[in-house]
Amino acid sequence: MKYIFVTGGVVSSLGKGVASASLGALLRARGYKVTAVKIDPYINIDAGTMRPYEHGEVFVTASGAETDLDIGNYERFLDLDIPAGSNITTGQVYQEVIRKERAGDYLSQTVQVIPHVTDEIKRRIRVAGETAGAEIVLIEVGGTVGDIESLPFLEAIRQFKFDEGDENVLFLHLTLVPYLGTSNEFKTKPTQHSVATLRSVGISPDIVMVRSKTKLPPEITRKIALFTSVRENRVFSSYDVGHVYEVPLALEEQGLGKVVEDLLGLERTMPNLGVWTNAVRTIKQPTREVTIAIAGKYTEMPDAYLSLMESLTHAGIANDARVNIRWVNAEELTESGEGGLATQLGNADGILVPGGFGIRGIEGKIKAAEYARTRGVPYLGICLGMQIAVIEYARHVAGLEGANSAEFDEYAPHKVIDLMPEQLEVGGKGGTMRLGDWPMDLRGGTTIAELYGVPQGGTVKERHRHRYEVNPAYTEQLQDAGLTISGVTPGVAGRGAGLVESVEIAGHPFFVALQAHPEFKSRPMRPSPPFAGFVKAALRGQSSDEQGTEATTASV
């Protein structure tokens, strides 16, 4: 097995995840079995309880792990499901070391960072690769070289090269070369210091990748090679591009794939990058455009909805369209009248309400769902967005005045959304939700079944992350009022009826909402069916509007 470790220097948020995923895509395009591991030096066990404003979205894997958003990048770029155990945190490592100490596994030993913590880190990396059946394992070390939190991990990967041999381990270091407009020059000193810091802990990079605004000129590449003792053909420029899906193509053009094959003693192969070329062409030169309004809670931090944004991009590729996102702060909709709603949501070709937690902005999201329902605007609800759609329908169509979710009002007269029975005895917050892949039985003859390619009905799987569900006590009343329950998970313990997985409104141009998070399974070459159908409906709505305008003009 071969191992590629990716570290970062100078500043955080340089894009190590995208760089690692892009390299993985180049290796996958050459036919290698690749998997990815993300190391996060924080003491949290996982990302599940962290603030979206600070950490971005929590990406949920098929196995139910709540992980760093970079795992989502790996799944999208590599077009595979990353197995459990591929997001390693300091909290996980120390928890296991302490468990072993208490169990007596280290009897007579003084438990220390070296070798016990570093051995546990190495064990987890190897297990992740073996579990995936990989030939090449990409390991991104989070944080910045020089941070105190990263030191045990850097020591572990230093040992890795000693353990596995030079031909099986490669170190890639990502740094920043800022451009100073006042002096009209690139500054390489931060990169020089970053590599020196990495060398001070015993790691010499085999490849240096440089983030910069534009592609580095040859003289700057030569200077970096000279001062970092890395050959010039191993210094790569990761410059700003229009879309992240251009990064693999830009790196391949510079020869990254060939250099990695040479360093790891692999036979050179020709990559098949046609799917990436076609995807980028569609992104940059679409035949149509569509605007989607996202009524959310974390609109100031788009990374909180990263997979959702990428899913819309994938849906755009499938429909040969550019998807423009209009961010709408749901709190601002709360007090909005008709004029305010029209300003925020008017001219949007579709409205999407994403997942989330907490009461802030809830009434604004309900108004967004009502706006879409009553005006025939395509609507897609994700997780909380489905619960919002049910609350709105219960209040304004089913006649259940005061309907709400128990999450927001435990004294509501009609708790149409309630805590799942199996959650009643749950005390802790971390890792205790309904997580990962769950089956959805789709009803034949519904929009959702058509989208998933099972028009007569069938079972599909999507990822979930929730504690609350549509209250089974109200499903009959909601259906009598015209709401279609198009998908359920049957046989859930503690209830007579199945858990509601999707709802829709018959006769509406497109009103579909799911309890699941289909964005987590969307890929550039395999878009999520609900997202692809949503964008298609939004484009269809544009055509209808244009035809209506033409008819009106003709009649005048």
Swiss-Prot record:
Q: Which UniProt keywords apply?
A: ATP-binding, Glutamine amidotransferase, Ligase, Magnesium, Metal-binding, Nucleotide-binding, Pyrimidine biosynthesis
Q: Where is this region: Amidoligase domain?
A: 1-266
Q: Where is the Glutamine amidotransferase type-1 domain?
A: 291-544
According to its UniProt entry, the protein's GO biological process terms are: 'de novo' CTP biosynthetic process; pyrimidine nucleobase biosynthetic process
One Pfam family for this entry, by name? CTP_synth_N
Q: Which GO molecular function terms does the record list?
A: ATP binding; CTP synthase activity; glutaminase activity; identical protein binding; metal ion binding
At the top of the EC hierarchy, this enzyme's class is: ligase
Which annotated residues bind ATP? S13, L14, G15, K16, G17, V18, D70
Q: Name one GO cellular component term.
A: cytosol
**Positions of Mg(2+) binding:** D70, E140
Query: Which residues are involved in binding CTP?
Result: S12, D147, I148, E149, K187, T188, K189, P190, T191, Q192, K223
Q: What is its EC number?
A: 6.3.4.2
Q: Where does L-glutamine bind?
A: Y53, G356, L384, G385, M386, Q387, E407, R467
Q: Where does UTP bind?
A: S12, K187, T188, K189, P190, T191, Q192, K223
Known partners and oligomeric status: Homotetramer.
Q: Any further remarks? A: CTPSs have evolved a hybrid strategy for distinguishing between UTP and CTP. The overlapping regions of the product feedback inhibitory and substrate sites recognize a common feature in both compounds, the triphosphate moiety. To differentiate isosteric substrate and product pyrimidine rings, an additional pocket far from the expected kinase/ligase catalytic site, specifically recognizes the cytosine and ribose portions of the product inhibitor.
Q: Which family does it belong to?
A: Belongs to the CTP synthase family.
Protein name as it appears in the record = CTP synthase
The species is Deinococcus deserti (strain DSM 17065 / CIP 109153 / LMG 22923 / VCD115)
